[in-house]
Amino acid sequence: MSRTKIAIAGALGRMGNNLINSALSNNNVELVGVFDVNDIDPSFINKNQIQENVFTTREESFEKADIVIDFTTPKALFNFTEAAVSNNTGLVIGTTGLDESHFNLLKQTSNSTKVFYAPNMSYG
C-alpha cells in the first residue's frame, strides 16, 4: 500500500509543528510539502529533520500532495480551494474563524475534490 502524500500549510505555527512531528513519525504518510505565509527558512527544514526534497511553496505542495492540511488563516482559504481543485488535492481545514462565505466556498469545492473541515484540533 502506498503512503498518503501530505503537505502542511501553516508549518511555522504551533499546530503546523505538531503535524510535522506526527507526519515524520508515521509510516502511513509521506511529508511532501511544508509552507506558510512567510518563506520557510532552510534552518527550519534542518531543525525539524525534514528531508531536503520536501517542497516549501504552496504551488509545489499542492501539485505533489494527495492532501493538504491547512492551519493558516481564513483569508488563505480562497487561494487554497482554487489550488486544491486544479490539482485534485484533498483539503483538511483546521483553521478557525470561518464565516458563511468560507463555508459556501468549501461546499462548492467539495463538488470537485475532497474536503474535511474540523476546527479546534489543538491540544488543551
Regions found by a protein language model. Give the residues of each.
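Extreme N-terminal starter segment of soluble prokaryotic enzymes
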Residues: 2-6
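N-terminal Rossmann NAD(P)H-binding glycine-rich loop of SDR-like oxidoreductase domains
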Residues: 9-12, 16-21
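Short acidic low-complexity segments
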Residues: 31, 50-65
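Short glycine-/small-residue-rich Rossmann-like dinucleotide-binding loops
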Residues: 72-73, 96
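Rossmann-fold NAD(P)-binding glycine/threonine-rich loop
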Residues: 82, 86, 95-117
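A short hydrophobic/small-residue beta-strand
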Residues: 90-92
